[in-house]
């Protein structure tokens, strides 16, 4: 199968996306597919040969991809590589995607996980992995996601949204400590734990440097978990325990910063309940194929709370979803093949795509 793996782009999660894309590319190549790894923003300029021939070129498309740095990338430096750009799609990106049998989306964050590229591909008849444009857009905005959770009875922490420059009052249902989060950010970029009103003002100022709308959410004391869902069925639960602080950008991507345990050490009744909540969350949000739902388990009440859903979860070989698949005895390459095959089903007769 001819596959284009799309990664990179102009997002605070750019480095994570490139790392995911490199892993997916290598796995699909090992599986015998004809694969190209493309940076969706930089594209592939100055191509001399017919684009079709690139799928058979003896070339390591992942050779220039580096690991994930401790801090989010400098996007202005990335933009400078395409001076005067008007389109967020680089040279030959759409052309190569139109030639392949499937686009494997290794994108994360804005312009990749928010439904825009999915809508464009739907209009152009380009097949791609994962959820469609509507479900992707719903899940990209944490405020909308949480409203959907509440409307369908899925427990989620109390929260309010605050717009830049807007007056607000913190309800008693939230109080301190609380979490400040950008509504549409990912990889915990723009996420801060706040202990008091002075810290809240500082955290809001930082969060507003990323987006104009911010979520303030009750901080649930306890343990953090994540649950991948594939074709409506939950995988084994993984527990995430940072060595210090909370699960921020640094703790997510720097080796040795976090202890991750899969399957999580939980009573069977809590495991079943959380997996059911993850499956219900994906159904409510219109997830297609696969996703990952993040949870907190309250150490006082024993209740679990859904935080958000990730329609394109991290796919570096050490990311959470690959670890959950490994608990089922599935290799990373087998997981990538599974996602590819699951995504193909929506384009079969009777599927939900043209």
Provide a role label for each language-model segment.
Residues 35, 127-128, 156, 178, ...:
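Hydrophobic beta-strand scaffold residues
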Residues 1-134, 138-140, 144, 151, ...:
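ATP-binding N-terminal substructure of ATP-dependent carboxylate-amine bond-forming enzymes
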Residues 288, 303-354:
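C-terminal active-site "lid" helix and adjoining low-complexity regulatory extension at the edge
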Residues 119-128, 196, 201, 327-329:
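A glycine- and small-aliphatic-rich helix-loop capping segment at beta-alpha/alpha-beta transitions
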Residues 195-276, 299, 303-305:
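Phosphate-binding site of ATP-dependent enzymes
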Residues 218, 227-229, 282-315, 325:
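Conserved metal-phosphate-binding beta-hairpin within the catalytic cores
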Residues 1-7, 11, 19, 90-97, ...:
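Active-site nucleotide/adenylate-binding loops and adjacent lid/helix of ATP-dependent enzymes
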